[in-house]
């Protein structure tokens, strides 16, 4: 009998072991769909991005008009741009839900998989930031100025670091050119990191909602979970196409329809919605260096998740107190996102400060305490 190429061919064998014959826990829920959705998001963003890059000019005098030209004169250029811009929002929705799932079900105990995932998040944030600068509208320019300026908070090397990032003494043509180069390069780095992420995941196998070892009871990924993933793709593309076709500018900033002008500062500089929670934490601290450190800590704190796990149970499925705390954390993040979009005035300042404090207290202090308390309750 001839060997099946799916199982013997060096490349097809890898695909087979990752997507077809992959042993999968039988009880994983829809929360396990987001990994594959993120993969589809990445492919979509790279394809639409490549098409946009063929019509884009990375020059301060031409960038804004080249984007307008793409939307007006290129066949379906408006659609490609709308899919790319709104695809980024969907990418972040999926990654935040994916991280939330990881925190809820204790997936962070697979340390290598979790750490590569956090590095992926940081790479995605960097890619989205440099990408937002490319249309060279008002918010692009001032967003780049404000965020890159944060590096100047570092003692001694700060100012040198900023000028090195800018390629001059302000955000100008060299900045735009290097940001375009980075925005083109980083998605391929993300694709490589994704393979590392998957390699580490397939070393241990997937976690499941009960947090139990399911090696004795696994089923092949295809045909049991492939249709489930397909349904996920359809349910993701529906809102994306609806957004791109009916309300493409809903999540954008009207300021970005004005070409960048270094002489006019917008009344309220703010990043895209998916960075608002971190921006609110940054703004909550009156000291510049303190704000930058809090901003970095708000994301880097995820690296500590495996060390803050004190419970004897892996998931929160049977831990009502931890569940309550988890949903308080989610609500807190939504409050931070809302505060980040508001002007810097009372009562938003104090709400932001309290929510920022609550964010770190919940993750660093309350989760370990509640975990230890639930261990005690198991003895009764």
Swiss-Prot record:
It comes from Todus todus. This is Cytochrome b. Binds 2 heme b groups non-covalently. GO terms for molecular function: metal ion binding; ubiquinol-cytochrome-c reductase activity. It is found in: Mitochondrion inner membrane. Gene3D superfamilies: Cytochrome Bc1 Complex, Chain C. Its cofactor is heme b. The lineage of its organism: Eukaryota, Metazoa, Chordata, Craniata, Vertebrata. Component of the ubiquinol-cytochrome c reductase complex (complex III or cytochrome b-c1 complex) that is part of the mitochondrial respiratory chain. The b-c1 complex mediates electron transfer from ubiquinol to cytochrome c. Contributes to the generation of a proton gradient across the mitochondrial membrane that is then used for ATP synthesis. The chain crosses the membrane at residues 34-54, 78-99, 114-134, 179-199, 227-247, 289-309, 321-341, 348-368.
């Amino acid at each position: 009998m001839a060997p099946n190429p799916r199982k013997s061919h060096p490349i097809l064998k890898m695909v087979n072991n990752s997507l077809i014959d992959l042993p999968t826990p039988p009880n994983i829920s829809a929360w396990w769909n987001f990994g594959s959705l993120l993969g589809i998001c990445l492919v979509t963003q790279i394809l639409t991005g490549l098409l946009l890059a063929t019509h884009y000019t990375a020059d301060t005098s031409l960038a804004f008009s080249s984007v307008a030209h793409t939307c007006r004169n290129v066949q379906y250029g408006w659609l490609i741009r709308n899919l790319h811009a709104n695809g980024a929002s969907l990418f972040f929705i999926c990654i935040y839900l994916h991280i939330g799932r990881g925190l809820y079900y204790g997936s962070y105990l697979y340390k290598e998989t979790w750490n590569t995932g956090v590095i992926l998040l940081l790479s995605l944030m960097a890619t989205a930031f440099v990408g937002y600068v490319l249309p060279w509208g008002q918010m692009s320019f001032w967003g780049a100025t404000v965020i890159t300026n944060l590096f100047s908070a570092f003692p001694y090397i700060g100012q040198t670091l900023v000028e090195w990032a800018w390629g001059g003494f302000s955000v100008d043509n060299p900045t735009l050119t290097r940001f375009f180069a980075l925005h083109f390069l980083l998605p391929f780095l993300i694709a490589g990191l994704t393979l590392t992420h998957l390699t580490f995941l397939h070393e241990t196998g997937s976690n499941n909602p009960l947090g139990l070892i399911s090696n004795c009871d696994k089923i092949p990924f295809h045909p049991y979970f492939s249709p489930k993933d397909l349904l996920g793709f359809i349910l993701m593309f529906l809102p994306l196409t609806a957004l791109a076709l009916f309300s493409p500018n809903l999540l954008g900033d009207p300021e970005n329809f004005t070409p960048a002008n270094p002489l006019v500062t917008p009344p309220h500089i703010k990043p895209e919605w998916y960075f608002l929670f971190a921006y609110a934490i940054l703004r909550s601290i009156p000291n510049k260096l303190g704000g930058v450190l809090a901003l970095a800590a708000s994301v880097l704190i995820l690296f500590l998740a495996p060390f803050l796990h004190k419970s004897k149970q892996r998931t929160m499925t049977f831990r009502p107190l931890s569940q309550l705390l988890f949903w308080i954390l989610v609500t807190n993040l939504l409050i931070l996102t809302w505060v980040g979009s508001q002007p810097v005035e009372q009562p938003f300042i104090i709400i932001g400060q309290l929510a920022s404090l609550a964010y770190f207290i919940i993750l660093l202090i309350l989760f370990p305490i509640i975990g230890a308390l639930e261990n005690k309750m198991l003895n009764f």
